[in-house]
């Protein structure tokens, strides 16, 4: 056990109840937790092989149970990690993991754009590939990582979708941004999905990812806290910021002009032990950015 783990174990008896009280208040609300409206086709943009589970995993499973065709497009090749394995070994292992996750979450198809992990770019080639995917699937909902995020690939994926939708004026569906590294301020969430019946499947899917060096407990704990946003409380929920095409484009364009360095500004929310730090690091700035760029569609 390294020094970091020893320190976390030492402070946990104090940190855990304090975290529970503060985040219990932070996520206290009277929102309506909903079941998904029935849709036919869903497209999920996942920069990395686990984002589809960490963010909207319970909601996707609910779509599948309702009969929707869920198509997941992974943007990167999955070749980067804190690991002793080669890039080729990692890519093969992660695709095997996704084969298992596909069955657990009920995904109809999985495809790969194969951009280098950590180097996602919105290029003419990637835009044309995404445009073709959207035209083929005709999704009523597109799930995408947020522009405001601590990982450059998550921001770049939002930009890629925004750039693509600028050239697709006939797209009438909605875009749901889902949380990964940076939890949404509760005031920014405009769709709260009750995933109590699907949470066990989400947990099962996270347990598939042996290739991942990070912990997942913080992501899953946040689903429990977000249940407190509902009145009456639900066991677990996933929160989204939903936009129409024009609103999503405006949101991304405005943030791009601001030229913030989000990886330096925010911390990943993957560990329960560090949730307070991760959620409240530059929280006022994050909340203000959502307020200034808000014109969502519900």
Model-derived features: positions:
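Short glycine-rich catalytic loops that host catalytic nucleophiles or stabilize transition states
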Residues: 75, 112-115
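Metal-dependent de-N-acetylase/amidase catalytic core
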Residues: 2-45, 103, 109, 116, ...
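ATP-dependent adenylation/pyrophosphate-handling site
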Residues: 37-88
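Short, conserved clusters of charged catalytic residues that mark active-site
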Residues: 55, 93, 125
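Short glycine-/small-residue-rich flexible loop motifs, especially phosphate/cofactor-binding loops
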Residues: 60, 99, 203
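Short acidic/polar alpha-helix capping motifs at helix-coil junctions
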Residues: 22-25, 62-66, 93-97, 107, ...
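Glycine-rich phosphate-binding loop and adjoining beta1-alpha1-beta2 segment
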Residues: 78-110
């Amino acid at each position: 056990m390294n020094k970091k783990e020893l320190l976390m174990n030492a402070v946990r008896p104090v940190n855990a109840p304090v975290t529970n009280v503060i985040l219990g208040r932070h996520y206290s609300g009277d929102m309506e937790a909903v079941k998904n409206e029935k849709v036919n086709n869903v497209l999920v943009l996942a920069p990395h092989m686990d984002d589809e589970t960490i963010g909207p995993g319970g909601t996707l499973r609910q779509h599948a149970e309702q009969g929707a065709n869920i198509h997941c497009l992974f943007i990167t090749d999955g070749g980067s990690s804190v690991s002793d394995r080669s890039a080729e070994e990692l890519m093969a292992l992660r695709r095997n993991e996704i084969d298992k996750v596909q069955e657990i979450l009920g995904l109809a198809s999985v495809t790969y754009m194969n951009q280098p992990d950590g180097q996602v770019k919105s290029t003419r080639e990637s835009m044309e590939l995404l445009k073709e995917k959207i035209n083929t699937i005709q999704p009523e909902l597109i799930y995408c990582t947020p522009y405001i995020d601590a990982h450059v690939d998550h921001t770049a994926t939002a930009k890629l979708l925004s750039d693509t939708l600028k050239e697709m004026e006939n797209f009438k569906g909605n875009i749901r941004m889902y949380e990964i590294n940076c939890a949404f301020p509760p005031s920014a969430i405009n769709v709260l999905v009750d995933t109590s019946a699907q949470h066990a499947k989400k947990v099962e899917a996270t347990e598939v990812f042996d290739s991942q060096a990070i912990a997942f407990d913080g992501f899953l704990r946040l689903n429990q806290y977000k249940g407190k946003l509902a009145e009456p409380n639900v066991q677990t929920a996933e929160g989204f910021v939903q936009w129409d095409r024009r609103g999503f484009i405006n949101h991304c364009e405005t943030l791009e002009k601001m030229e913030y360095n989000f990886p330096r500004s925010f911390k990943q929310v993957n560990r329960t032990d560090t949730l307070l730090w991760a959620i409240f690091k530059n929280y006022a700035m994050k909340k203000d950015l959502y307020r200034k760029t808000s014109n969502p569609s519900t």
